[in-house]
Every structure is written in structure tokens, then in C-alpha cells.
């Protein structure tokens, strides 16, 4: 990793950048889309079949019939991706499952056969669902719209050690617990705690009942007894610890108390009088045990002492205690006694309470830890987690009895590594078996645990305490007794400061649910409902359901077929709902390539089972040290979703358990190797990791001590202690943040805005890549999915190119690439691909062959490089406003194209069919002048608001016509009487040019929705130039609205006559602390000035045209023309050498040569790359500016001091006071355009209820004049304005109609009437029992009934107060 100033790095055939990166990267960057694509393929290839297979075979209750799984097949898609987009359909593949029904009595097997209705398929089997398929871009096409499923970040299942936790109950209630707590969180099942409360010295378990209405708490020993452990075994495992003894004292499951319970007393009484024919269900086993207990006790009393019988009696007593404890737990937790897994039954039909408990806690159907949960449980509950820095209270021996670590040894890192290694190999003699009853062993198999004794206090070393670890050989994703024992031990150990609390916000405790897991969950939900349906049908079929059993007389029975007992609708609905309405399924953001790629790498903490956006908790939203290299600390939305929506870091991926991982280079004995290892957040906590931008030479650190991170701290470590080093500085941030140059010089809040606003950049008609980039631009554009990329396995040669097609020949094969041409994106931008290869060009796999929107030569090009000055100008750039030169408007520098789709359906109605026609009633000829003979707009027509796009008439309700009327209608074609006009018209603000019309008819075999005869889609294109009110931004969070577009001649200019393009307010920089924009400004100008010297250097070095193409991104033909024109101008000026050319050949001469060659000056740029955290520093910038002839220190070259220049006002010709910072900045035009926002209302819709105008542009609504605005007018006494606003402009229905009529007839505006809101007030008063009447004139009413309130008040104050009532009135009026 040798340190250089810069290298000229070739990124592709047309892209070369001056690269200032300081670190060599021998790392193949993974494709940025692979994460979700690989997850979906994993689901389709393996998990889908496994999920479907899991519910089969399904057997009937009587056992006669069983439904067997044979196989499944995904057929080829019905339509291509392009057809699905065009027709508004889903790109999917039909899934068929082959099943067979077996009659176990007759041995008959009936398979599913191909349906006669299913002509499209050759597959035998039942149609299960059409499953949307992922495209090469990593998206799904659902109903013609591209969608994407974002990943969800959730808490991982497993065990968590906390000081406070809660169980959520129904009705938004919670049960909060504090103390030493271990929370057992399953992927499926009920969360429960094992804890020691703050004020108690024994261990308890808290469960939530199956209904979720309440919690139930019992001592841990009661739970262990319910699982089949007896008192002696419990005390032996936990070495008679006081907490366990106290737990035993606090429960009733001992011989004395259990046999005194009402249940067993009643059982003793009724034991002999029981009915032999009666079924006792689950209680049968308890009765049998009690019978055996009574019998053995009687025998012992009769025979005297008998050791064998006494032992057998003790076993029976323990079994009764266990069964009784299990029964109480089943009842208190409302656990279902049905659907018990066969492996937990003592025989095929016998069910005990213990088997119900085992089924509830140890079956993956009811309590699934998942693979990730098992990994977390094993990691947390292993012995090594708690042994570090503890002193052994016994010799640690291997399985052969050899002492490995002696007693009284303090366990350090070396000893811990030895214990981990021997445990992994199974050679350490610390494994013990739990003594369980034989019948329990059948359900639990052999239960093992690991145990080592350590001293309670390292100093005193008098008393020891056992540390119990779980069985690390377990690999099933279920809970085990071993886990319960190790958790109990952990809670006990916490009282002695043994063990660690978990940080719930640590990324090691969170995992990603990718699309495979989300789809698997949906598939399982659908299969559960299918299974229930099949069970019901099979129960009826074999006569188990007596109420529906057919009698013998009704024979012969209908033959049973697979199709008659299965309903796959629930499975189909599951997938349909997921891709249409699931919270994590979103419209793909196609604003630009960066927006699309970022959308695909987004992760959300919201969604089903996630966090609500209303949750005010800041800890879950905050940046955590474990996010390093996995989640970007910068890119997140502003507002309610901050910290809940995140972006993956540049190199982040996931492991097989869904935990986020990031790559590191391994360091061995202070030497950096090329070996890469991917680490999770939990693994990182065990290592010392160096940052990548250290002084390194020949893979060795230059210093003896280097800055490294260990967990959350940054410290200096000896190089021999370093385990790993970062791959690259940019692995900390997301792709959007890594495309901001000088990110390290920006405040994080502004960097956040910069990253977010790049995603809002509108693709321009002539995009140009940034002169100051970060080197990421090519990778982002390449992986976004918007560029056309050659994907052939072998190298090829371009054989044909035109605007819409590229053909590449590889050997005897020829691949044809149809380019996307002027398609509408989800955000209504123009998605267009342009070839960048030429015939005869060699291409390799992964080469970009065509640019998409916002791309230039395969690089991301979101905006334009413009000349920016930081200066004020007549106050027009006050408060971040932007002043623009008219050149940018005239030359279409910031012009963009937008495409809007308008759709209309021609339907079958109960009154008759709708009709597409040009003959539309009550529509003027001017509104339909561009319609063709069929009533559809012609392509190329310029349409404005209100113009008809598709003429359509719909039949009115049936009206009986006389024969004469029918004849007249037939002769004159008068459709106005029985048809109404329902044409598709251009909405408000929708004017533009018709670009394309698509027609889909049922008669042409298109699949349309029910009752749709024909569907017509019209695409209207708008060409939007930059204008006042549009929003622009840089890449550093420096945003503003265009306040003025100034003629070029009035703009300030440099001394050489170069006019400024944009003026920004200098006050927008210091307080925002985004200094990156200033550094970009200076470096950009330096690189632009260096372009001239680089052109001359290449010319005098006699470089070929291909080199010009590489350095400046222009095509070879243009390069050849440029060389010819350069030669002509140099000869005219009699310039003979490079030195002479550098002095005499000016920027104007270059512009002249470019103009003659047909090349824009903006497109000829010598670009640079300054990667984040390792790019251009202060020294590099000074050197680049000096090289370009801009002296950054003292202005000796006379053209600028510190990059500042003397500006001349274009209006007056006078110099500005002081020097101004001028340079090249990359500016973006954002999606917030004034055309989409500006709106006015004259006449429009009104609310049905309030009769007030609606609000918002979409509803052609008005601007609300609210309560406070009314107060303002009242304060000024603006009575007439108020009257107008509160009546005819609001809800005076009669008044506004009269006013409208008066205006169009040119008459004076009449008096306003009574507003609806006043009527509402009177009704509310009447509702209070007050009689309210309205009189128009005071004189016509009985004057005695009215009093002037002011007169009343003055009268009663002047006269003596006569009674308390008047006194009370005056006090209330505060007189």
C-alpha cells in the first residue's frame, strides 16, 4: 500500500480519472444487488419446495386416507419482462404441485392429472400460485409496475441478559419486570423470562398465556419439575445454591404439599369408584400414576421396608409431582391439548400433561428458535462467555482425565482460547448428563450440559459457584432443557458479577429478514389454511365427522380426488397480498440510477413485528459503534422515519443466519495479508481492528503502535496485537454518501441531506459526469440496473449498433440487446438508453454497452459542472436562494424530460358497452382537433389542459324510445340523448406532446380485467427547462430555490470575460459547516484549467485518437476531428512546441477547435477522483491549483489569491468589492419543480358535508383562509374582504352561484347570503335545547325582545345593584 499523490486511473475505455486515493485495494467489490437476488433464488431453488413439503403427508383422523407429496414444478413465465411492463401484467411463473391421495385400506393411489381447462400447461399437478419472479435488475414487475421488497432489520431470536424487560399483552397492556433477567425470544412462540427480582432471592419464570391476556409467574424449580427433573437432580446440578433452595421453598411441588391439594384428595376418594368405561383424556396418566402410588404404598405398609419398592415408590412420587406441576402450568397458560406432535406422545394415542409442555416449549411447530436463535443461544450460553477473568475452583481435565488447566488459575485470553478449542473438538471433560425418568428421556432424548466450578470471589477463594453452559453440540432450532439450565445458571452468576448484560441496540443482536424469509413466512401462512381445509375434507371422507357421514343408502359414494379435497386460494392470496400491499413491498424509486440502487440496498426497522414510526425512543434510532462497516451512519431520512430507515454500507452483506457482515483483511504478526474474512458485529467485538488509512509500506505498518478500535473505543495498540485491518475507508458509509467528494470536510447533518438529495436529482437531457468525483460513479451506474451491460461468458465483438439495438458476436453466437427507449419510470422521468459502443469494438463480460438516464460514458451523471461564485447580488440570493445565468436556460443545460401516462378503460356496463369514438356530444371541435377517425389522439400532437386524449361515450340508463325517435337517431346519429361523454382529457398542468399510444383489446388476445373491452394508454411528454421556483442543490447539502434568471450580459464575469453561471450566498457556508463544497469549487476549477494543458500534452506527444477518447470521454471520430482542428489553429498561430503552446494557446482557442469539431466545451473535461476519507488533502489541493496556474497562497501568478478572483459586475462594468471564490461545482436539478407545485383555483369542487372548497392541487382545491388569518383581517377591520372570504368564496351556496352568474354576465356582484357554517351553528345551539331563530331586519321583529348588550351593561352599573344575581353577572363580565 504505497502512498502516492495521484495516478491517472483507467476506469473503462471511455473513462479516466486522476485518482488521489492513498490506499491500494486488492479486493473484488461484490455486485451491489447480489444480496436480495441471491436470497430470492435461494427461496425458489430450495426453500419453496421444503416449505410446501413440510405439511405433507396429511393423514385423516381415522387413518384411512393420506395426501402424499410427489413433487413440484415452476413453469416458464407466460410473458417476458417487456411484455409484462407494456401490458400492465405481472412477470411471474405458475407453480404446480403434484400430489397423490392414498387409500390405506384398499391401497389405491390417485394422482393429479393435467386439467383439460389448463391448456397452457403440460404439467400434471394442482395449480398452487403464480409467483412473481425477480428480474436481472433485482426487481419485481407486478401489474406492469416495478416493485422492490426492502429488507427488514429485527431483533434476533435467542437469549438476552437484561436489567429490565417487558411482556406485551392484549389491549396494549404491558407487564414490566426489573432485576436480573434472561429474556428467551423465539422466532415463533411465546416470549418468557427467567429472572431474579430485585427484592427477592430466588429465581422465577414469567410466561405469557397462550391467549395473551395475562402473565403467570412460578419458581424456576416448579418449571424444571414440570419438565421431569426431581428435587435431588436440581440441587445436584446447581450445587445446592441458596437461590435454588429458596425457589424450592417457594413452591408447592413436593410430596407433602402435592398430596394435600384438593385435586389429589378427590382423586384418592374416587379412585376405587371410577367407571371403567369412562375416558379421562389427558388426566388418564395422572390417575394411573396415583393408582400405582396407592398400590406400592399399600404393599410397603404390608411388607415392611423394601429398598427396591421404596425406590420405585419415590420414582412414582416424582412422576406425580412432575405431572401435577405440568398440569397446573398447562391450565394457567391456557395451552391447547390438541395437535400434540407424535414424538412427544408416550404411545400413539396417549397424551400427558408433560407431553403437552414438551410440545409447547420444545417443538419447532409451536416454539421455534430458528437457526439464528440457536446460534445466538449457543454463543450466549457457552461457558467461555462467563469464564474470562475468573479463578478456577477445580482442575480442568480432558476426557482422558489429563489436567489441562490447574485449579486456582486465572482464566486469561490464552486459557480461554484453549477451552474454546477443546470444547469445539469435544475433548474437554466438562460435559454431564441430566438424570431423567425413562419416559421423559423418550421425549427429551439425552440432555447434556457443561459445568465448571469457579470461585465466587477471585480474591477470597473460599466458596465456589458452578458455571453451567448449554450443550454446544445442539443444532436443532428448538429450545432444550440444557438451555433452561444454563440460563438459570447465568441469572445466578449475575449476582456475583459473572457474565455480561446485553446491549439491545448492538447489531450482533439484530438480523436482516431478506426476501426469502419474508416470502417463506407468507407461504407458511397460506399452507396452514390449506392444511386445515384438507383435514376437514379428509375427516368427512373417512367418516370421522359423524354429522356429515353418508348413510349406507346413499351409496355409491363420490370418488375422492385430490382436486376435491384441496383449495389453493389461501396460498395464492398470500403471495398476491405480499406483492401488492405488504409494508415492505414498495414502488421502485426510479428517479435516477443512484435512487434505484439505494432503494434496493435500503433496510427498514418498521414493518410487521417491527418498530412504529411514532415510537419516540432515540436509542433505537441512534448510530451504534457496531454499525461500523455494516450500516451507514449518514444516510437516513429526515423526519419521523429518522434512524428507522437505513442504508447498507458499501461492502455490507449477510451471513447464513441473517447477521450483517463486512470484510476485513487479516493481519498476522504485524503483516497485512491479502486474505479476506467477513465478520459479524459480535465477532468484531473479540478482535482488535486497525483503520485502513494508516502509514503502510510493503504490507507492513511504519509505526510500532497504530490507532485501532476495540469494541466501542479507539486506542493505540502494538502492531503485533492487531488482528484485522479495514479494506477501505469508504466501507463505513453507503454508496450515496461515498459519492460525495470531500465528505470528511462536511458536517454529518449536511452530508445526510447531500446523500438524500442526490437521490432526488432529475436526469437531464445531456448529462455530464462530475469533474470532481469519488471514483464510485462507474460502479454505481453499472450495478444500478439502468445501464445495458454485456453479460456473455466469452469476450465478444460489437457487430451492429443503432439507437435501439446492439448486437454482439461471440464466436458463432450473437447476442441482441434491445435498448429501453423513452420509457416512463415510476417517478415519471424519462428512462432512455443510448449506446456507447461502436461497431468492431471488443467487449468483455460486465462491460457497460449503453448509458441509461443520468449516465455519461457509463458513469453516474446526475447534474452539470457549472461555474459558481460565492457572492451576493442585489439580495436575490437571500436565504439560500440561487441566481442563475440565462445561458443555462437557453442552452438546455438543466433541461429534463418527463413522461406522464394517462389510461382509460372501455367497459361493458349493465346499460350497454362503452364506445371509443370521435363523435363526442357536447365537446367543441377545437378540443378534439387532434383526434383521429377512431377518437384517439395522434402521436406528436401538442396538447394542453382540457384537450381530449381519447373520445369515449358511455350509455345512460335505459330510456324507452318510440319507433320514430329510434329512426331519427339512426338517421342523424344523435347520441347525446342516450349517451354521456366520459372522455379521457388532459388534466390540470398536464400539457405536453403525445409520444406514444398503446391499445390493448380483448379481441387481440390481451388479458384485461373483467368487463374491460379495450384499454388505451396515452403517454404525454413534457420538456421542462429550468425556471424560477425550481429547486437545485450541490452534493454537500447546499440546497436552494432559483430566485432569478439573469441575462448573460448582466451576470458578473471574470477579468478574461468568462461569465459566472450560478451565484450562491456565501452566508450559507460557515454556519452549515459543509466546507467540502468550497474544496470541490477550487479543485473543480483547477481540473478545468488543467484540461487545456492535458489536451496540448496529448497532442504534442502524438497520442492517437483513442487516448483522447479515454482521457476526455469523447468518441474516436470526434477525437480525430479535434486533432485536425488543433493542428490547424496551432499552425495558424505558428506555435511549434508544447512550452510555447502553454503560453500562447488560450482557452478561447480550445473552444474554437472544439466548436469546429462538434464537441461541447462542457463535455471536454479532465476528471478527478477524490475518494472519501482518503482523497485530496490540503497539500494535494495546493499542488493541483498551482499546477493549474492558480496560486493558492500569495497570488503571484496574478490570477487569483487562495482561489479567489476579482469579479466585474456585468450591469455596471465595475469591480466587486473584495475578491470572490469562483470555481467549478457540480449542481443538481431536483425533482421539486415549480411546475408540479404551483396551482391556482377559480372554480372547482366543494366538500359535500361542509360545502367548502376542497384543498390541494390534486383536487383542484383552494388555499385555506384559516382561523388565524381571519383574526388578522379582523384586527385591520377589513370587513368587505372578510365578508367575501366567509361567504361567497367559502360555503354560501346560493351566493356563490349568483356571483358566478353575475360575473359572466358582467353585472355587479350581488349581496352575499347565509353561509352553511352559520346554519350549522344554529343547529348545534338547537341541539343544546336553545330556540334559535334568524330575522333579517331588526325593525320587523318585536323590539321588546332585543336588548343592546352595551346599553344593558351601562344601565346596571349606573343603578344600584339590586340583588346577588346582577352582582354575579357583573363579576362574570369582569366589570
UniProtKB/Swiss-Prot annotation:
Gene name of the record: rpoB
UniProt keyword terms in alphabetical order: DNA-directed RNA polymerase, Nucleotidyltransferase, Transcription, Transferase
Species this protein is from: Malacoplasma penetrans (strain HF-2) (Mycoplasma penetrans)
InterPro entries named in the record: DNA-dir_RNA_pol_bsu_ext_1_sf (IPR042107), DNA-dir_RNA_pol_bsu_external_1 (IPR019462), DNA-dir_RNA_pol_su2 (IPR015712), DNA-dir_RNAP_su2_dom (IPR007120), DNA-dir_RNAP_su2_hyb_sf (IPR037033), RNA_pol_bsu_bac (IPR010243), RNA_pol_bsu_CS (IPR007121), RNA_pol_bsu_protrusion (IPR007644)
Catalytic activity: RNA(n) + a ribonucleoside 5'-triphosphate = RNA(n+1) + diphosphate
EC number per UniProt: 2.7.7.6
CDD domains from the UniProt entry: RNA_pol_B_RPB2
Function: DNA-dependent RNA polymerase catalyzes the transcription of DNA into RNA using the four ribonucleoside triphosphates as substrates.
Pfam entry (one): RNA_pol_Rpb2_1
GO BP term, example: DNA-templated transcription
PANTHER family, A to Z: DNA-DIRECTED RNA POLYMERASE I SUBUNIT 2
Assembly mode: The RNAP catalytic core consists of 2 alpha, 1 beta, 1 beta' and 1 omega subunit. When a sigma factor is associated with the core the holoenzyme is formed, which can initiate transcription.
Transmembrane spans: none
UniProt keyword ATP-binding present: no
Span of the signal peptide: none
Broad enzyme group: transferase
GO molecular function: DNA binding; DNA-directed RNA polymerase activity; ribonucleoside binding
Family affiliation: Belongs to the RNA polymerase beta chain family.
Protein known as: DNA-directed RNA polymerase subunit beta
GO cellular component: DNA-directed RNA polymerase complex
Amino acid at each position: 500500500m504505497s502512498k502516492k499523490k495521484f495516478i491517472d486511473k483507467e476506469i473503462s475505455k471511455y473513462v479516466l480519472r486522476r485518482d488521489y486515493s492513498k490506499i491500494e485495494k486488492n479486493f473484488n467489490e461484490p455486485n451491489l444487488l447480489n444480496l436480495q437476488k441471491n436470497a430470492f433464488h435461494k427461496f425458489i431453488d430450495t426453500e419453496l419446495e421444503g416449505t410446501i413439503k413440510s405439511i405433507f403427508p396429511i393423514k385423516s383422523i381415522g387413518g384411512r386416507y393420506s395426501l402424499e407429496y410427489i413433487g413440484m414444478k415452476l413453469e416458464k413465465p407466460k410473458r417476458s419482462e417487456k411484455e409484462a411492463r407494456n401490458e400492465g401484467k405481472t412477470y411471474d411463473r405458475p407453480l404446480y404441485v403434484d400430489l397423490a391421495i392414498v387409500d390405506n385400506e384398499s391401497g389405491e393411489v390417485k394422482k393429479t392429472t393435467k386439467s383439460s381447462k389448463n391448456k397452457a400447461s403440460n404439467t400434471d399437478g394442482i395449480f398452487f400460485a403464480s409467483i412473481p419472479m425477480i428480474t436481472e435488475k433485482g426487481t419485481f414487475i407486478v401489474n406492469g409496475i416495478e416493485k422492490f421488497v426492502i429488507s427488514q432489520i429485527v431483533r434476533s431470536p435467542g437469549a438476552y441478559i437484561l436489567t429490565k424487560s417487558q411482556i406485551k399483552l392484549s389491549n396494549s397492556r404491558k407487564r414490566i419486570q426489573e432485576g436480573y433477567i434472561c429474556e428467551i425470544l423465539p422466532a415463533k412462540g411465546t416470549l418468557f423470562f427467567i429472572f431474579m427480582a430485585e427484592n427477592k432471592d430466588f429465581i422465577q419464570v414469567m410466561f405469557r398465556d397462550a391467549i395473551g391476556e395475562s402473565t403467570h409467574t412460578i419458581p424456576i424449580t416448579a418449571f424444571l419439575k414440570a419438565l421431569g427433573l426431581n428435587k435431588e437432580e436440581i440441587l445436584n446440578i446447581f450445587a445446592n445454591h441458596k437461590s435454588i433452595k429458596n425457589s424450592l421453598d417457594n413452591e408447592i411441588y413436593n410430596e407433602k404439599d402435592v398430596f394435600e391439594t384438593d385435586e389429589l384428595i378427590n382423586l384418592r376418594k374416587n379412585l376405587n369408584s371410577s367407571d371403567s368405561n369412562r375416558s379421562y383424556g389427558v388426566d388418564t396418566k395422572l390417575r394411573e400414576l396415583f393408582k400405582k402410588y396407592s398400590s406400592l404404598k399399600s404393599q410397603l405398609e404390608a411388607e415392611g421396608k423394601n429398598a427396591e419398592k421404596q425406590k420405585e415408590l419415590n420414582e412414582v412420587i416424582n412422576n406425580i409431582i412432575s405431572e401435577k406441576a405440568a398440569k397446573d402450568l398447562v391450565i394457567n397458560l391456557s395451552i391447547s391439548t390438541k395437535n400434540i406432535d407424535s414424538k412427544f406422545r408416550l404411545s400413539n394415542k396417549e397424551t400427558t400433561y408433560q407431553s403437552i409442555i414438551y410440545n409447547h416449549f420444545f417443538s419447532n411447530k409451536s416454539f421455534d428458535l430458528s437457526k439464528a436463535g440457536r446460534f445466538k443461544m449457543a454463543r450466549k450460553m457457552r461457558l467461555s462467555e462467563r469464564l474470562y477473568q475468573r479463578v478456577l475452583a477445580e482442575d480442568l481435565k480432558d476426557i482422558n482425565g489429563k489436567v489441562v488447566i490447574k485449579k486456582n488459575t486465572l482464566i486469561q485470553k490464552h486459557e480461554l482460547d484453549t477451552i474454546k478449542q477443546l470444547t469445539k473438538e469435544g475433548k474437554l471433560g466438562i460435559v454431564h448428563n441430566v438424570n431423567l425418568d425413562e419416559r421423559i428421556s423418550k421425549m427429551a432424548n439425552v440432555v447434556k450440559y457443561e459445568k465448571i466450578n469457579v470461585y465466587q470471589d477471585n480474591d477470597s477463594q473460599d466458596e465456589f459457584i458452578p458455571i453451567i453452559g448449554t450443550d454446544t453440540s445442539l443444532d436443532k432450532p428448538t429450545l432444550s432443557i440444557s438451555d433452561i439450565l444454563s440460563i438459570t445458571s447465568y441469572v445466578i452468576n449475575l449476582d456475583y458479577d459473572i457474565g455480561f448484560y446485553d446491549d439491545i441496540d448492538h447489531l450482533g443482536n439484530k438480523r436482516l429478514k431478506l426476501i426469502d424469509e419474508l416470502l417463506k413466512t407468507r407461504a407458511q401462512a397460506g399452507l396452514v389454511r390449506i392444511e386445515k381445509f384438507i383435514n376437514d375434507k379428509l375427516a368427512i371422507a373417512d367418516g370421522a365427522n359423524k354429522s356429515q357421514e353418508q348413510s349406507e343408502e346413499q351409496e355409491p359414494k363420490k370418488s375422492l380426488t385430490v382436486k376435491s379435497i384441496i383449495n389453493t386460494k389461501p396460498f395464492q392470496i398470500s403471495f398476491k397480498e405480499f406483492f401488492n400491499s405488504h409494508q415492505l413491498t414498495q414502488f421502485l424509486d426510479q428517479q435516477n440510477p443512484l435512487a434505484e440502487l439505494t432503494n434496493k440496498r435500503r433496510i427498514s426497522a418498521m414493518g410487521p413485528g417491527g418498530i412504529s414510526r411514532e415510537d419516540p425512543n432515540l436509542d433505537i434510532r441512534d448510530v451504534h459503534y457496531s454499525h461500523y462497516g455494516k450500516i451507514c451512519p449518514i444516510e437516513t431520512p429526515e423526519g419521523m422515519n429518522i434512524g428507522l430507515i437505513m442504508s447498507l454500507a458499501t461492502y455490507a452483506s449477510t451471513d447464513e443466519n441473517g447477521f450483517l457482515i463486512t470484510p476485513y483483511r487479516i493481519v498476522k504478526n504485524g503483516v497485512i495479508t491479502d486474505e479476506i474474512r467477513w465478520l459479524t458485529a459480535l465477532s468484531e467485538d473479540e478482535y482488535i481492528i486497525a483503520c485502513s488509512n494508516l502509514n503502510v509500506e510493503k504490507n507492513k505498518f511504519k509505526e510500532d503502535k497504530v490507532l485501532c478500535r476495540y469494541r466501542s473505543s479507539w486506542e493505540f495498540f502494538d502492531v503485533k496485537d492487531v488482528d484485522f485491518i479495514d479494506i477501505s475507508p469508504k466501507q463505513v458509509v453507503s454508496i450515496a454518501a461515498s459519492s460525495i467528494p470531500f465528505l470528511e470536510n462536511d458536517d454529518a447533518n449536511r452530508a445526510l441531506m447531500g446523500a438524500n438529495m442526490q437521490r432526488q436529482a432529475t436526469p437531464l437531457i445531456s448529462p455530464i459526469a462530475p469533474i470532481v468525483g469519488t471514483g464510485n460513479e462507474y460502479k454505481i451506474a453499472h450495478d444500478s440496473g439502468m445501464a445495458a451491460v454485456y453479460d456473455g461468458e466469452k469476450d465478444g465483438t460489437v457487430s451492429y449498433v443503432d439507437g435501439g439495438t446492439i448486437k454482439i458476436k461471440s464466436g458463432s453466437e450473437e447476442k441482441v440487446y434491445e435498448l429501453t427507449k423513452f420509457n416512463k419510470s415510476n417517478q415519471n422521468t424519462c428512462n432512455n438508453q443510448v449506446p456507447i459502443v461502436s461497431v468492431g469494438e471488443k467487449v468483455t463480460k460486465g462491460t457497460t454497452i449503453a448509458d441509461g438516464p443520468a449516465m455519461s460514458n457509463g458513469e453516474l451523471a446526475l447534474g452539470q459542472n457549472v461555474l459558481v461564485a460565492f457572492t451576493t447580488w442585489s439580495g436575490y440570493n437571500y436565504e439560500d436562494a440561487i441566481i442563475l445565468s440565462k445561458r443555462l436556460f437557453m442552452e438546455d443545460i438543466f433541461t429534463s424530460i418527463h413522461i406522464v401516462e394517462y389510461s382509460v378503460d372501455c367497459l361493458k356496463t349493465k346499460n350497454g358497452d362503452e364506445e371509443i369514438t370521435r363523435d363526442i356530444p357536447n365537446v367543441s371541435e377545437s378540443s378534439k382537433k387532434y383526434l383521429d377517425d377512431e377518437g384517439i389522439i395522434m402521436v406528436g400532437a401538442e396538447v394542453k389542459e382540457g384537450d381530449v386524449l381519447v373520445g369515449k361515450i358511455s350509455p345512460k340508463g335505459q330510456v324507452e324510445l318510440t319507433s320514430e325517435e329510434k329512426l331519427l337517431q339512426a338517421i342523424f346519429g344523435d347520441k347525446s340523448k342516450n349517451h354521456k361523454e366520459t372522455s379521457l382529457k388532459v388534466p390540470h398542468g398536464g400539457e405536453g406532446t403525445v409520444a406514444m399510444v398503446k391499445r390493448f383489446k380483448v379481441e387481440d388476445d390481451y388479458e384485461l380485467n373483467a368487463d374491460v373491452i379495450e384499454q388505451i394508454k396515452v403517454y404525454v411528454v413534457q420538456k421542462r427547462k429550468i425556471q424560477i421556483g425550481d429547486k437545485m442543490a450541490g452534493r454537500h447539502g447546499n440546497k436552494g430555490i432559483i430566485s432569478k434568471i439573469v441575462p448573460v450580459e448582466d451576470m458578473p464575469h471574470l477579468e478574461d470575460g468568462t461569465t459566472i453561471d450560478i451565484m450562491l450566498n456565501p452566508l450559507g457556508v460557515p454556519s452549515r459547516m459543509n466546507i467540502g463544497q468550497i474544496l470541490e469549487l477550487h479543485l473543480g476549477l483547477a481540473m478545468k484549467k488543467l484540461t487545456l494543458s492535458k489536451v496540448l500534452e496529448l497532442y504534442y506527444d502524438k497520442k492517437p485518437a483513442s487516448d483522447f477518447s479515454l482521457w476526455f470521454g469523447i468518441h474516436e471520430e470526434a477525437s480525430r476531428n479535434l486533432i485536425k482542428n488543433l493542428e490547424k489553429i496551432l499552425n495558424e498561430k505558428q506555435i511549434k512546441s508544447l512550452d510555447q503552446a502553454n503560453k500562447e494557446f488560450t482557452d478561447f482557442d480550445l473552444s474554437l477547435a472544439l466548436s469546429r469539431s462538434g464537441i461541447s466545451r462542457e463535455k471536454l473535461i479532465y476528471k478527478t477522483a477524490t475518494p472519501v476519507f482518503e482523497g485530496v488533502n490540503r497539500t494535494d489541493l495546493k499542488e493541483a491549483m498551482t499546477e493549474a496556474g492558480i496560486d493558492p497562497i500569495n497570488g503571484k501568478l496574478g490570477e487569483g489569491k487562495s482561489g479567489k478572483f476579482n469579479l466585474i459586475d456585468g450591469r455596471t462594468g465595475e469591480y466587486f468589492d473584495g475578491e470572490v471564490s469562483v470555481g467549478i461545482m457540480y449542481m443538481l436539478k431536483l425533482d421539486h419543480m415549480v411546475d408540479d407545485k404551483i396551482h391556482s383555483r377559480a372554480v372547482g369542487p366543494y366538500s359535500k358535508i361542509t360545502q367548502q372548497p376542497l384543498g390541494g392541487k390534486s383536487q383542484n382545491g383552494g388555499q385555506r383562509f384559516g382561523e388565524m388569518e381571519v383574526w388578522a383581517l379582523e384586527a385591520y377591520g377589513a370587513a368587505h374582504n372578510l365578508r367575501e372570504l366567509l361567504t361567497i368564496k367559502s360555503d354560501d351556496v346560493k351566493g356563490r352561484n349568483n356571483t358566478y352568474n353575475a360575473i359572466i354576465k358582467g353585472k355587479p356582484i350581488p349581496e352575499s347570503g347565509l353561509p352553511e357554517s352559520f346554519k350549522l351553528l344554529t343547529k348545534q345551539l338547537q341541539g343544546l335545547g336553545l330556540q334559535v331563530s334568524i330575522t333579517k331586519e331588526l325593525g320587523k321583529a318585536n323590539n321588546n325582545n332585543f336588548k343592546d348588550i352595551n346599553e344593558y351593561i351601562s344601565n346596571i352599573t349606573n343603578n344600584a345593584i339590586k340583588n346577588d344575581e346582577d352582582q354575579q353577572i357583573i363579576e362574570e363580565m369582569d366589570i
